[in-house]
From Swiss-Prot:
Keywords: Membrane, Transmembrane, Transmembrane helix. This is Small integral membrane protein 8. InterPro entries: UPF0708. One of its GO terms (cellular component) is membrane. It is a single-pass membrane protein. It comes from the Eukaryota. The gene is SMIM8. Residues 1-24 are annotated as: Disordered. Its main location: membrane. The lineage of its organism: Eukaryota, Metazoa, Chordata, Craniata, Vertebrata. It comes from Homo sapiens (Human).
Length: 97
């Protein structure tokens, strides 16, 4: 007697060319000038180049840290010459110690 009514079937139509937009900023309508000034927003990321940049930046930071550590070690040393004329490196001492 009372059977459940069947839900209406919806037909999924494929998106038309004008309606389809790619995700992200690549699908946004922008001017050519904006795309020329900001190409990194519209170009697919290049993972090998990103990895190379990350390694290079890490090595630069490590080298700067190394130079800083070397400079800190040299700051407390000075060249001393004994009575016989031999020179050697000696650590600075404070008069207050």
């Amino acid at each position: 007697m009372s059977s459940a009514p069947e839900p209406p079937t919806f037909k999924k139509e494929p998106p038309k060319e004008k309606e389809f937009q790619s995700p992200g900023l690549r699908g946004v309508r922008t001017t050519t000038l904006f795309r020329a000034v900001n190409p990194e927003l519209f170009i697919k990321p290049n993972k090998p180049v990103m990895a190379f940049g990350l390694v290079t930046l890490s090595l630069c930071v490590a080298y700067i840290g190394y130079l800083h550590a070397i400079q800190e070690n040299k700051k407390d040393l000075y060249e001393a010459i004994d009575s016989e004329g031999h020179s050697y490196m000696r650590r600075k001492t404070s008069k207050w110690d």
